[in-house]
């Protein structure tokens, strides 16, 4: 306490000098105090409120009349209680302004009657604000309750109020000069007492109307108390008059922020930002960086209750912190935490952050308090965002939580649908899997009764196929696969009476049927139109993919008959090992070989020996031996597709189409005039126009020019 008071007295040199000048008028002050007590006793008969407040003042004055040393402790304790009363008295500020107007008018009428009317002002002010008068009465009574020995205590308490005056002088210097020249001659000793009270709690002024009436009161008291103006402190009265004028004129004053609380929230934020700048300057001048951070938490109690500006709470908290020491800040922290938890309002917290962003020293404390408020709000209510900065994040987090709460509601539906679909599939699978996978497993394990027969001649008949398989066993059914137009697709299915007969018929794979080596494979029993899917498992693909023991041979004499070529290849490669299959594709237009062959071996050893015969001589021709690949099989399949494309064109054209669909031997087919139809899908003329027009659109115009 002593150190802080000394520092404040040294720094505020002008105000300390003015205080020393005012010491000579202490005796007059005590006389004024007696008059105040008389005036209070007279005013008790007017209103009920006027009776209650003077009784409190007398009780406090009785407590303060012991020796000067006790005055310090009592004032510090009362100031600490005042800081608590300020928190409780804040909700009453908006109710009191109208009631304060009537006593103010009475004061102006009484002040013009006699010289001691200005002494009634400190007693009437508490009538308008009973809960707020504690700080003002304590400051005045502590000054008036002691003699010359009390002058040692005055610099301790008065510098709390003058600390704010240098800021007002620095911020609004021009206005001070004008107000000094106008009001320096019109100050009185009673006004100095009143000014000490006002500066001790300048933020308690309720409205602009009351302030204007107080200025009128000061004018009336100035005109009536010219005889007592010699005892005034010349520096305090101009400052008070300046503050009163600034409260009605500028937005930087402390009382103006109270009037703006009644006006609009936007003006509060602007004025609180300006006042917070001036407060931060005063805090830096007071050389107490630790205390301003603690009182900075006071706006939480006031803003959450009423949304007042930050400047008011900082002024009152700075004064109470300098007077009461370390005890009020602890109580303030408790008040701030309790008020923050009980009354969290999003608007007030938004105003707090708008003012906190403009003062650097208050950021750390306010942010920490905001975080506490946020945590408690989210735990208690979880309804509104705490501040502007966290509003977007809170909204996004709430949206995310909503999305997450929606997703669990949606995903079970998806899971239920998936389960229902799965149940449908599981319900349908047994009926479908009975002919599918179990049949295939049975076909592979126990053997199927049906064989897939591929590479059939297009002019083959069912009787011919039946005779071909008579040696294997009894044929129950023969099904040829056809296109939609009824044309034969070149393969079919043969069903035997027993699985043993079907297995025995597999041995006929590669044998010629009407000049073509027949492809045989166990088929899945699906019905008449299974060859489309059975084609994937057809014999001419399967050996090259499944066994991997197939070689591709070319370079032999193609002028020989198919049977002669087969026999010569079997003799040539017979020394390599067991040959399981020999396939020699042929041109179905002429019946001659296409110049290539495929040969399957039983094991990999035989296959490796067959590779060694690459480049060997067979009938004067050098053989080319290589591993069979899917591409040649696709070529053969392409031959089938060529036939399909052209078969749609009409009669007899399927051979030409297949010839054209092969490896380029189809010039004869095109020479017949309808071989180009394999590239189209409908007849002679239209496919010809498409084939001539699509590759070269320019030739079309050229033909038109020639015509």
From Swiss-Prot:
Keyword terms of this UniProt record: Nucleus, Repeat, RNA-binding, rRNA processing
Low complexity composition bias: residue spans: 158-170, 336-347, 376-394
Subcellular location: Nucleus, Nucleolus
Pfam families: RRM_1
Superkingdom field: Eukaryota
GO molecular function terms listed in the Swiss-Prot or TrEMBL record: ribosomal small subunit binding; RNA strand annealing activity; RNA strand-exchange activity
Principal place of residence: nucleus
Keyword rRNA processing: yes
GO cellular component, one term: nucleolus
Chain intervals with Acidic residues compositional bias: 75-85, 108-120, 144-153, 219-232, 248-263, 271-287, 312-326, 355-370, 395-406
Biased composition range(s): Basic and acidic residues: 30-40, 47-60, 300-311, 407-417, 657-681
GO biological process: eukaryotic translation initiation factor 4F complex assembly; formation of translation preinitiation complex; rRNA processing
Domain spans labelled RRM: 449-525, 549-630
Biased composition (Polar residues): 420-429
Region: Disordered, residue numbers: 1-446, 527-546, 629-707
Listed PANTHER family: EUKARYOTIC TRANSLATION INITIATION FACTOR 4B/4H, NUCLEAR RNA-BINDING PROTEIN SART-3
Functional summary from the UniProt entry: Involved in pre-rRNA processing and ribosome assembly.
Protein name: Nucleolin 2
Species of provenance: Oryza sativa subsp. japonica
């Amino acid at each position: 306490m002593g150190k802080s008071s000394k520092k404040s007295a040294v720094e505020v040199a002008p105000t300390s000098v003015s205080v020393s000048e005012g010491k000579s008028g202490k005796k007059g002050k005590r006389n004024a105090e007696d008059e105040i007590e008389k005036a209070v006793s007279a005013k008790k008969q007017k209103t009920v409120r006027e009776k209650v407040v003077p009784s409190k003042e007398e009780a406090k004055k009785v407590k303060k009349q012991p020796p000067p040393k006790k005055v310090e402790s009592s004032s510090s304790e009362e100031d600490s209680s005042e800081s608590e009363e300020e928190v409780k008295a804040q909700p009453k500020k908006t109710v009191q302004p109208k009631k304060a107007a009537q006593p103010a008018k009475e004061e102006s009428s009484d002040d013009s009657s006699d010289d001691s009317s200005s002494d009634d002002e400190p007693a009437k002010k508490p009538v308008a604000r009973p809960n707020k008068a504690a700080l003002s009465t304590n400051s005045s009574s502590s000054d008036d309750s002691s003699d010359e020995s009390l002058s040692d205590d005055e610099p301790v308490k008065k510098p709390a109020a003058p600390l704010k005056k240098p800021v007002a002088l620095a911020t609004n210097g021009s206005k001070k000069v004008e107000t000094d020249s106008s009001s320096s001659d019109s100050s009185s000793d009673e006004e100095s007492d009143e000014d000490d009270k006002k500066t001790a709690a300048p933020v308690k002024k309720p409205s602009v109307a009351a302030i204007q009436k107080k200025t009128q009161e000061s004018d009336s008291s100035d005109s009536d108390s010219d005889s007592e103006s010699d005892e005034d402190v010349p520096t305090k009265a101009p400052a008070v008059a300046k503050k009163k004028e600034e409260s009605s004129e500028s937005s930087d004053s402390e009382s103006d922020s109270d009037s703006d609380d009644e006006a609009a929230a936007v003006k509060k934020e602007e004025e609180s930002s300006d006042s917070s700048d001036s407060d931060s300057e005063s805090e830096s001048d007071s050389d107490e960086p630790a205390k301003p951070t603690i009182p900075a938490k006071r706006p939480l109690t006031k803003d959450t209750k009423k949304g007042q500006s930050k400047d008011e709470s900082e002024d009152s908290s700075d004064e109470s912190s300098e007077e009461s020491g370390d005890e009020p800040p602890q109580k303030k922290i408790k008040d701030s935490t309790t008020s923050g938890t009980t009354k969290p309002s999003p608007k007030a917290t938004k105003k707090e952050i708008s003012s906190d962003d403009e003062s650097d020293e208050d950021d750390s404390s306010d942010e920490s308090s905001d975080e506490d408020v946020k945590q408690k709000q989210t735990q208690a209510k979880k309804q509104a965002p705490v501040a502007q900065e966290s509003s977007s994040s809170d909204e996004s987090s709430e949206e995310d939580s909503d999305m997450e709460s929606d997703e669990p509601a949606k995903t079970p539906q998806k899971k239920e649908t998936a389960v229902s679909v799965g149940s449908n599939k599981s319900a349908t699978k047994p009926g479908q899997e009975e002919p599918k996978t179990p049949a295939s497993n049975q076909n592979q394990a126990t053997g199927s009764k049906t064989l897939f027969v591929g590479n059939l001649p297009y002019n083959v008949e069912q009787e011919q196929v039946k005779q071909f398989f008579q040696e294997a066993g009894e044929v129950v059914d023969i099904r040829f696969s056809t296109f939609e137009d009824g044309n034969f697709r070149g393969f079919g299915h043969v069903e035997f009476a027993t699985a043993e007969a079907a297995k025995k018929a597999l041995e006929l794979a590669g044998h010629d049927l009407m000049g073509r080596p027949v492809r045989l494979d166990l088929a899945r029993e699906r019905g008449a139109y299974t060859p489309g899917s059975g084609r994937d498992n057809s014999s001419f693909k399967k050996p090259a993919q499944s066994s991997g023991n197939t070689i591709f041979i070319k370079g032999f004499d193609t002028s020989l008959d198919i049977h002669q070529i087969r026999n010569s290849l079997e003799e040539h490669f017979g020394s390599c090992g067991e040959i399981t299959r020999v396939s020699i594709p042929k041109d179905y237009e002429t019946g001659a070989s296409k110049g290539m062959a495929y040969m399957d071996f039983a094991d990999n050893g035989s296959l490796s020996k067959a590779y060694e015969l690459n480049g060997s001589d067979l009938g004067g021709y050098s053989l080319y031996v290589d591993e069979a690949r899917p591409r040649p099989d696709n070529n053969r399949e392409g031959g089938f597709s060529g036939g399909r494309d052209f078969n749609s064109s009409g009669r007899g054209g399927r051979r030409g189409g297949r010839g054209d669909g092969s490896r380029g031997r189809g010039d004869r087919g095109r020479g017949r005039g309808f071989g180009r139809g394999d590239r189209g899908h409908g007849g002679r003329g239209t496919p010809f126009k498409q084939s001539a027009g699509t590759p070269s659109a320019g030739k079309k115009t050229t033909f038109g020019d020639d015509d």
